[in-house]
């Protein structure tokens, strides 16, 4: 069936003083389509609409069918049409519109809308349109079609061919930045923990007949917990199992020795005690407070309810990775995930002073023209590497995933319910999912002490999707440690849309553009308290998110952390508390042989195939 493929890029041409909220309305064959609402200029929508063509095949019907695109302002009391344009269907067939700036017919204001409008029949046509939008008139249709036929729909290779480059280079109007530079870089070796568990591309674990698994052994210093100021150099005697372990230095000149030992044989492996492998440049006072070199602790007291030292760096960086996947054109299609990334980005920039720069905030959405910024499995893992690269004490990181989540069987026998939680990239049907062990490996394990990460995962089965050690029970107001926790050295918290065995829903009240239940609630609560940040504690935020979500669905918002802390701690992007875990790495208390209940086992498999959100 034919469809009109409409891509809305950016609204421009308005004056700086016209800083009102805007959205796009599209009218086609007695149906109305609406974009998300953007709150300030410039208005970069980057949204795609697929409009079915349902008419008789004659010229009269072609001319009588009008595609209308309107720009509206959003106000408290009413909405107003600002400008519009329209196209007859036969005009769309005759003259393709590829990423062109259209001067709209003004009603209130003069403005320009950058759009693409094409007729498509299949996914190959969409691929052609996306590539045509990138190259414009620099490549003719035949060159693009030939490249598509040559590489069988592999967009990355097609663009390489058309640009005659050895590596993916600069696209139209898109410049190289740190994220793009990471794309073809292998993960750096982790100097704090060994990889746990071993990750293979297809999530297949070998030699499982004897319940074998991988171990992670602690290589962080004892001196973090005993007031010693030890220097660990290349001349220090290694234990037997560390004979061949290299020493790495990070950006703060801290020496770390990598333990390369990891056994797949449970019967022959031993649990080693941590060795004195101290940070050579960290000093401790008599109260065991840490003062990293070149960083200043400017506070004379800790965050409310906390007895721990706070980190602050005068040159700290704030970075955010925002992933929203609507799975366009599939049976799993969602409506509000890309909206979630826009809302969260606006909140981070306006309230929490993140720089609105591609070197500080990266968005991966599936309607992005540049294939580097689409949420494929490869791009997501590369983006996680970008987010955590060169992190240092005082850095603040934020991670958002909005999309589908599922569960995969845990062949390592570590998960309490027997399943790994996972997120679904846009190409999960061909490239596979990303399980929680991988998210932990790429997102959590690379983080140094004194680094803060706040993660928000709005998807099904997301409760423990990044494998943090502690879960906060809102009803009892108590922390509970995971059965087999992985303790880390950084300061990490996670808000999840639901428990591991639940589904998470979208909210579409008609008052605002659709979005995930968790993100919609979180953004609304934080924006309502824009001028009173001192009252937003973790307890306050979690309680209000929970109440807001329960108004629309029966899912249970989950909160987890890398360490226990007083929930009266302020929710902000400034204070970083010292991690007090006295053990690091994977702690195996009990291997899970099987699920306790066949009914639970059956429920997990049923939930695995649910894709409500």
UniProtKB/Swiss-Prot annotation:
GO terms, biological process: apoptotic process; proteolysis
UniProt keyword terms in alphabetical order: Apoptosis, Hydrolase, Protease, Thiol protease, Zymogen
UniProt xrefs under Pfam families: C2, Peptidase_C14
InterPro entries, sorted: C2_dom (IPR000008), C2_domain_sf (IPR035892), Caspase-like_dom_sf (IPR029030), Metacaspase (IPR050452), Pept_C14_caspase (IPR011600)
EC number: 3.4.22.-
Residue runs in coiled coils: none
Regulation of catalytic or functional activity: Activated by Ca(2+).
Keyword Hydrolase recorded: yes
One GO location term (cellular component): cytoplasm
Principal EC category: hydrolase
A GO MF term: cysteine-type endopeptidase activity
Location of the active site: 404, 460
Record's function text: Cysteine protease that cleaves specifically after arginine or lysine residues. May play a role in apoptosis.
UniProt subunit comment: Monomer.
Family, similarity comment: Belongs to the peptidase C14B family.
UniProt name for this protein: Metacaspase-1
Lineage, top ranks: Eukaryota, Sar, Alveolata, Apicomplexa, Aconoidasida
Name of the gene this protein is made from: MCA1
